[in-house]
């Protein structure tokens, strides 16, 4: 009879280790779960630390970038300001110093020649750019250079000499207001209009 009791004891002893083992396995699983949660927490902490580090690193660089953009904008504004003052503002015709109306040397060659031809002044034309170029050794061999010598009647003169002749004639010329003012008004009103002639049959 002791044998069956022993068998029960063995079965109980066998059952106890299995239960204990079962408990042990459950305990090990819970430990593993706890370790996994701890690892997850550590990973989350590491991610938070990395994000904090990235934020800390991005802070100065972003501000540095904004400061760089501001400095670039200021430099561009200064460049544009200098460009306007140098190349745009100074080239405006209203800002240029206007010459005196009686300074005939400032007038163009075409105007002086038209004035001479209109009033039929006994004075030759002034030298052009080609005439000045004839002053070289190569230009001295041309016909135009020989024509401009002192012995010829149609020699060219300098622009300054022609301007002096035109100024003296203008000072000595008597102006009639009854003839000058109507012509001036007519020219101002019709300076940009083209002459049109209509034929009606």
UniProtKB/Swiss-Prot annotation:
Signal peptide: none
Main location: nucleus
Record-annotated disulphide pairs: none
Biased composition (Low complexity): 25-59
Ranges for region Disordered: 1-70
Compositionally biased spans, kind Polar residues: 1-10, 60-70
Keywords: Chromatin regulator, Nucleus, Repressor, Transcription, Transcription regulation
InterPro entries attached to this UniProt entry: His_deAcase_SAP30/SAP30L, SAP30_C_sf, SAP30_Sin3-bd
Gene Ontology CC terms, in alphabetical order: histone deacetylase complex; nucleus; Rpd3L complex; Rpd3L-Expanded complex
Entry annotated with the keyword Repressor: yes
Record-level Gene Ontology MF annotations: transcription coregulator activity; transcription corepressor activity
Additional observations: Present with 704 molecules/cell in log phase SD medium.
Annotated PANTHER family: HISTONE DEACETYLASE COMPLEX SUBUNIT SAP30L-RELATED, SAP30
Role description: Component of the RPD3C(L) histone deacetylase complex (HDAC) responsible for the deacetylation of lysine residues on the N-terminal part of the core histones (H2A, H2B, H3 and H4). Histone deacetylation gives a tag for epigenetic repression and plays an important role in transcriptional regulation, cell cycle progression and developmental events.
Family, similarity comment: Belongs to the SAP30 family.
Subunit and partners: Component of the RPD3C(L) complex composed of at least ASH1, CTI6, DEP1, PHO23, RPD3, RXT2, RXT3, SAP30, SDS3, SIN3, UME1 and UME6.
Name of the protein in its database record: Transcriptional regulatory protein SAP30
Organism: Saccharomyces cerevisiae (strain ATCC 204508 / S288c) (Baker's yeast)
């Amino acid at each position: 009879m002791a044998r069956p009791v022993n068998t029960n004891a063995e079965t109980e002893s066998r059952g106890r280790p299995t239960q204990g083992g079962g408990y042990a396995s459950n305990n090990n699983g819970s430990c593993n779960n706890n370790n996994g949660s701890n690892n997850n927490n550590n990973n989350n902490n590491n991610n938070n630390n990395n994000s904090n580090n990235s934020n800390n690193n991005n802070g100065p660089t972003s501000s540095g970038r904004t400061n760089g953009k501001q400095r670039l904008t200021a430099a561009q504004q200064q460049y544009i300001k200098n460009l306007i003052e140098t190349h745009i503002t100074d080239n405006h015709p209203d800002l240029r110093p206007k010459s005196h109306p009686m300074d005939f040397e400032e007038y163009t060659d075409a105007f002086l020649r038209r004035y001479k031809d209109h009033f039929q002044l006994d004075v030759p034309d002034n030298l052009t750019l080609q005439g000045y170029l004839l002053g070289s050794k190569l230009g001295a061999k041309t016909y135009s250079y020989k024509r401009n010598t002192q012995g010829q009647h149609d020699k060219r003169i300098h622009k300054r000499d022609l301007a002096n002749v035109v100024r003296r004639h203008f000072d000595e010329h008597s102006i009639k207001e009854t003839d000058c003012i109507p012509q001036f008004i007519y020219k101002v009103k019709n300076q940009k209009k083209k002459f049109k002639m209509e034929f009606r049959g």
